[in-house]
């Protein structure tokens, strides 16, 4: 098998930067090797567990919290915060595979997991999830909102949005982290990007979310558009290959085929009581003013308490 290479590029595409994607070694281990248990676990828990592709590592998400799968010196490791250390919940044989790691994290080598029985990964992940649930203390997080919106948009409709990634950072840009990144169909049948910002309950950032965050994220995607296009062309291909997405033909438009207004910004206020905040100096009132200040160069929408991301819904 070929090793150490990401997806192939055309001559014109080589000038652009692919900032997320897995090389052939990582893909092999997921499909046929020691990491295959991750895909099996995802298939059994699609409604609450997500796998996202990074730059030659993975983030596994549950209730908004990430567990990393990283490679170091040819070995693969499961890593997370000490808050979610599963050691005390594991049987005696598995306790010994949990090791300390830098930056206040623990880690487990997949080589050690492989030496145990076939249910070892399931037991480890179940224990981590129990620790996350205990940490949340029953309180819904913005991460739960992300799961809900992601699951409801895995399949794209005529006017819908396909969510393709979450917690998107363009390396070195210093322009923040996009909650969710999606694709929408243009009139010509091709696709372009949508940035989604989720606000849970009465987050003070709501007041300036359009001019502070939505504008910044749209500018980032537009400025680095071809890097985003090349990256997610490959990420979509890899997700489909790994069974993380159903097959779908998304021809992402070139930058010269779109305008900045084609890149839509969507704000979702979730778990939000409108009546409670219905006052002149309330967050919603200030957000509406901020929305107006965005101007005509940007295309933005606001959704309240909905899991239906569709251009026919609510505010336009």
Describe these PLM feature segments.
Residues 4-316:
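Charged, terminal alpha-helix-loop-beta segments
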């Amino acid at each position: 098998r070929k090793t150490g290479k990401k997806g192939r590029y055309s001559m014109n595409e080589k000038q652009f930067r692919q900032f997320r994607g897995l090389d052939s070694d990582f893909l092999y281990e997921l499909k046929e090797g020691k990491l295959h248990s991750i895909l099996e676990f995802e298939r059994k828990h699609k409604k609450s567990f997500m796998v996202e592709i990074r730059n030659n590592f993975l983030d596994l998400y549950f209730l908004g919290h990430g567990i990393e799968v990283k490679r170091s010196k040819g070995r693969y490791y499961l890593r997370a915060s000490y808050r979610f250390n599963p050691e005390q919940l594991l049987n005696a044989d598995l306790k010994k595979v949990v090791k300390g790691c830098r930056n206040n994290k623990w880690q487990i080598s997949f080589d050690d997991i492989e030496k145990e029985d076939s249910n070892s990964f399931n037991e480890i992940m179940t224990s981590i999830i129990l620790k996350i649930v205990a940490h949340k203390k029953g309180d819904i997080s913005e991460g739960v909102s992300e799961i809900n919106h992601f699951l409801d948009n895995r399949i794209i409709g005529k006017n819908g949005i396909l969510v393709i990634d979450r917690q998107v950072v363009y390396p070195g840009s210093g322009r923040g982290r996009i909650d969710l990144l999606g694709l929408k169909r243009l009139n010509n049948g091709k696709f372009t990007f949508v940035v989604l910002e989720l606000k849970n309950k009465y987050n003070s950032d709501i007041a300036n979310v359009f001019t502070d965050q939505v504008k910044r994220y749209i500018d980032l995607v537009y400025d680095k558009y071809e890097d985003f296009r090349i990256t997610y062309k490959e990420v979509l291909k890899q997700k489909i290959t790994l069974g993380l997405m159903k097959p779908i033909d998304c021809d992402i438009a070139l930058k010269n085929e779109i305008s900045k207004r084609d890149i839509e910004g969507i704000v979702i206020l979730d778990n939000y009581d409108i009546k409670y905040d219905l006052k002149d100096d309330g967050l919603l009132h200030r957000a509406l003013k901020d929305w107006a200040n965005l101007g005509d160069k940007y295309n933005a929408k606001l959704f309240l308490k909905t899991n239906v991301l569709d251009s026919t819904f609510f505010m336009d």
